Amino acid sequence: MRKIILLLFISSMSHSLSAQPTEILQGAWVREEKEKKTVILITDQLISVAAYNEKEKKFLYTWGGSYVLHEGQLQLQYEWSSNDSNLVNTSASIPFFIKGNKLSLGENLTELERGPAVPSGDLQGVWIISGTYTDGGLNKRPNPFLPRRTMKLIVGDYFQWVSYNVVTKKFFDAGGGRQTHAKGVYSEEIGYFTKATASVGKKMTFTYAIDGDDWRHSGQKSTGGQLDECWTRRRYIELQFKPGSN
């Protein structure tokens, strides 16, 4: 009887340890150097890495995609890479290590500190732009997931959006920085923006509303003019548009 209980305990511990890294990895991880800031955003589904020089308003690179964890490795399926489009639609196994409050991912991304804990907000997660609002109502795109994809991650108090084509492997643009959201007000402090470096450092405030899996994002663009966008949770978009998901 004792042997059975011991085996059940060991089995339970092994299961919890194998599941633990996924939860530990999720969040925003940051490393600040003299002229470079590296931010890794990790959800249960996606990882995004971005590096930039906020002082000089220079974007350095971004890459990322979907992932799973297996035997101490982060198995990445690249969806975008600003520096090397040949990586797109390929996979890589990247070792990771967490010690205390710091993450090391592979050989080059070391000693990133976990971002501060923030209240869980209703915008946290991964979103795909799916349409725009006009006087006539909501106009949804025929297929917001393929081949071109514009995605936004909100993790902790950081955000990143990235636009890319998963068929041609072309990277278009990206932007990111710090964010807060609560009670229908969403604010961004822009840390990098490939389209318009003049926007870096700006603090923007928008209104937002959640309707099911849709997020209505309204306000003024950092480059001027109004926006009234619909973003939809990626999981829902995948169920609708990802080949083989139905």
Language-model segments: what does each one mean?
Residues 4-13:
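Sec-dependent N-terminal signal peptides
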Residues 15-174, 187-246:
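Lipid interaction determinants
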Residues 177-181:
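Beta-propeller blade signature
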Residues 182-186:
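Glycine/small-residue-rich hydrophobic helix-like segments
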